[in-house]
């Protein structure tokens, strides 16, 4: 007896996420076709499960190849899309917390950590309001977590102790060194 299965009645399997190598190929193509040769970029593993993410520098930093600001691009559903940006007063650096990598920038009283979760920017913004309970004028800004630009958690104002606890829960790995968008540099992707 010959038996045929109708594939229309089979359950759909999970759609496979893009591999790191296919993401890097997409970033290489995007850099070649859509980004000026005068721009600087870096690919860092801050995406979903530390998958590759493309950063394009926007504000030059304080050393060769360093930037204090960047746009963040992510490959999802067959396209490279801008998902966010990060900019502040310090050179962008790579940090880690609970196995997830983040990029960071900040000032003496603020620390911004960004990664990509579920294909969206995930920003943890911490601000030091010092002794705001004693001196209400010392309120700086509310500490929040944003996903895709929307606040998903509001911590309110943090005093120095709370701010330092939050900030120090991330571990420094390295400064992010951007490279010029040249054919030679893209070959190394």
Question: Which positions does each model-derived feature cover?
Answer:
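Beta-propeller blade repeat segments, especially FG-GAP/WD-type strand-to-loop junctions
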Residues: 67-84, 113-118, 146
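Repeated scaffold domains used in trafficking and secretory/extracellular systems
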Residues: 38-40, 88-97, 109-112
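Sec-dependent N-terminal signal peptides of Gram-positive bacterial secreted proteins and lipoproteins
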Residues: 1-12
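Acidic/hydrophobic-patterned starts of short beta strands in beta-sheet-rich repeat architectures
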Residues: 47-58, 98-103, 122-124
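Beta-propeller fold detector
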Residues: 81-87, 153-157
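Short, solvent-exposed loop/turn segments at conserved positions within beta-propeller repeat blades
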Residues: 63-68, 135-136
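Acidic, small-residue rich beta-repeat scaffolds with periodic aromatic anchors
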Residues: 7, 18-20, 25, 29-35, ...
């Amino acid at each position: 007896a010959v038996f045929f299965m109708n594939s229309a009645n089979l359950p759909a399997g999970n759609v496979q996420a893009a591999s790191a190598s296919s993401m890097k190929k997409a970033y290489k193509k995007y850099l070649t076709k859509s980004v000026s040769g005068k721009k600087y970029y870096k690919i860092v593993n801050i995406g979903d499960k530390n998958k590759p993410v493309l950063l394009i520098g926007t504000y030059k930093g304080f050393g060769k190849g360093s930037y204090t600001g960047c746009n963040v691009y992510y490959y999802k559903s067959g396209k490279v899309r801008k998902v966010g940006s990060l900019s502040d007063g310090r050179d962008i650096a790579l940090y880690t917390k609970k196995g997830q990598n983040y990029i960071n920038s900040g000032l003496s009283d603020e620390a911004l950590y960004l990664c990509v979760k579920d294909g969206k920017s995930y920003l943890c913004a911490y601000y030091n309001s010092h002794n705001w309970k004693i001196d209400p004028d010392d309120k700086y800004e509310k500490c929040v977590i944003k996903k895709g630009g929307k606040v998903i958690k509001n911590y309110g104002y943090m005093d120095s102790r709370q701010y330092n606890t939050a900030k120090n829960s991330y571990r420094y790995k390295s400064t992010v060194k951007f490279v010029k968008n040249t054919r030679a540099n893209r070959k190394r992707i």
